[in-house]
Design a protein with these regions (language model features):
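A gly/proline- and charged-residue-enriched helix-loop-helix capping module
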Residues: 98-139
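Conserved, mostly hydrophobic/aromatic
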Residues: 75, 96, 163, 225, ...
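Active-site cofactor/substrate anionic-group-binding motifs, chiefly glycine-
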Residues: 63-114
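An N-cap/entry alpha-helix motif that binds or orients negatively charged groups
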Residues: 1-65, 69
Length: 353
C-alpha cells in the first residue's frame, strides 16, 4: 500500500493531518455550545401517571452480540491531535471500564500511517480490560490502498472487539484535500468483512444512513449499523469553518441542515431491517432523546460531542455525564410505565403537530 499523501501549502502530510485533527476538536467543542435543531423535538412519549413500577427496579441492561451490557450507551468516535487525543482516550477508557460501556475510538488512520497513536495503543486496553472497544477506519481508505492488513493493525493496536468503518462523503467532498474516490467502497467492504476476524460496524459521521444504504450494507455482511444522523456534530460546517478559502466556505455553507435526522432514520432502518443491531447517534442531547430513539427501534445510543468537554477534563467528569444520562433515561422509562428497555419499545409515542 502506498503511504503517499499530499501536503497542503508545503506542510508535511503527517503534520497537516495532525493539525487538522486539532482544529476539528476545537471546532467540535464550539459547536457543542450552540443550540441546534434536533429531530427528536418532533416526537413525544406519552406520560403515564400510574406507572405501577418502582423506579429503583427498572432495568436498563441490553443484550448486544450475545453479551449483556449494563447500560445501552456507546461512547462514540472522537478525534483530536496527539496530546489532547491521548488524554481524551485515556479518560474515556477509564469511564468505559467503570460503567461497562462500549468505547468506539476515532479514526486510526493517523496511527496506521505512523504520525502518532494519540492514545490509541495497547495502553487503551490496559485502562479498559473488560469494556468492549471498537477500532475505526474510514471507508474511503478501502479504495485508496487499505485492506485487511491495515484493518487487522487497527484492531490489534488496541485489542479491539470490532471494527467501525465510517462513511463521511460530505465531509470529504467539502474538505480541502479530502478523499474524492468512493467508487468501489461497497465491494471493498464486502471483501474486508469476509477476511477480517472481527465484526464490522458501519456508521455515518453526522448525516444519517438511509434504509436503501442500510439494506446494501446488510447485504455485504455488516454486523451492525450506527445511524449517526444530523442534529449533532456537523462536519461540513466544521470543514467550512477551518477553510482558508472563501469559495470553499461558501460551498460548505450550502450544506447546513443537510442529512437525515436521527429519529426518522432509526425508524426507517428498523422497518427495513427488523433484525439488524442498530445504534442511534447524532443529536442525542439527553436521556429523553435516548428513550425516543430506543422506542423507535435503536438497540444502543451513541454520544460523542456531548461527552467531549467532560472527556477533556477527567474520567470522573465522563462518569458524571453518563450518570446524568442514565438517570434521565430511568425517569423516562418510569414515566412511561416501562420496567425495562423491551417494555419501552411498546410505550406510546406521537409526532408533534
Amino acid at each position: 500500500m502506498s503511504n503517499e499523501r499530499t501536503a497542503t501549502l508545503g506542510v508535511p502530510a503527517d503534520a497537516e493531518i495532525l493539525r487538522r485533527k486539532d482544529e476539528h476538536l476545537d471546532l467540535a467543542l464550539g459547536q457543542q455550545a450552540q443550540k441546534r435543531r434536533s429531530g427528536f423535538d418532533d416526537y413525544q412519549l406519552e406520560h403515564c401517571a400510574l406507572p405501577e413500577v418502582d423506579l429503583d427496579e427498572i432495568d436498563l441492561s441490553v443484550e448486544w452480540w450475545g453479551r449483556r451490557l449494563p447500560l445501552p450507551f456507546v461512547i462514540s468516535s472522537m478525534t483530536g491531535g496527539p496530546v489532547r487525543g491521548a488524554r481524551i482516550n485515556a479518560h474515556l477508557a477509564e469511564a468505559a471500564e467503570a460503567l461497562g460501556l462500549v468505547l468506539a475510538v476515532g479514526s486510526q488512520r493517523v496511527a496506521i500511517e505512523g504520525a502518532g497513536e494519540a492514545g490509541l495503543g495497547r495502553e487503551l486496553r490496559r485502562l479498559a480490560p473488560t469494556a468492549p472497544i471498537w477500532s475505526n477506519l474510514g471507508a474511503a481508505q478501502l479504495v485508496a490502498g487499505y485492506g485487511v492488513d491495515e484493518a487487522r493493525r487497527a484492531v490489534d493496536m488496541i485489542e479491539a472487539d470490532a471494527l467501525i468503518i465510517h462513511l463521511n462523503p460530505l465531509q470529504e467532498a467539502v474538505q480541502a484535500g479530502g478523499d474524492r474516490r468512493w467508487k468501489g467502497v461497497l465491494g471493498a467492504m464486502e471483501t474486508l468483512i469476509r477476511q477480517l476476524e472481527r465484526p464490522v460496524v458501519v456508521k455515518e459521521v453526522g448525516y444519517g444512513l438511509s434504509a436503501e444504504v442500510g439494506r446494501a450494507l446488510a447485504g455485504v455482511g455488516v454486523a451492525a449499523l450506527d445511524v449517526a444522523g444530523s442534529g449533532g456534530t456537523a462536519w461540513a460546517d466544521i470543514e467550512g469553518a477551518r477553510s482558508a478559502s472563501a469559495v470553499d466556505r461558501k460551498v460548505a455553507d450550502a450544506f447546513q441542515g443537510w442529512g437525515l435526522e436521527t429519529p426518522a432514520a432509526v425508524e426507517k432502518l428498523r422497518a427495513a431491517l427488523p433484525d439488524m443491531p442498530l445504534i442511534a447517534s447524532g443529536g442525542v442531547r439527553h436521556g429523553v432523546d435516548a428513550a425516543v430513539a430506543l422506542r423507535l427501534g435503536a438497540d444502543l445510543i451513541g454520544q460523542a460531542g456531548p461527552v467531549l468537554r467532560a472527556a477533556l477534563e477527567s474520567p470522573e467528569a465522563v462518569l458524571r455525564h453518563f450518570d446524568i444520562l442514565k438517570r434521565q433515561l430511568l425517569i423516562a422509562c418510569f414515566c412511561t410505565g416501562s420496567r425495562d428497555l423491551l417494555e419501552l419499545r411498546g410505550a406510546n409515542l406521537s409526532r408533534r403537530s
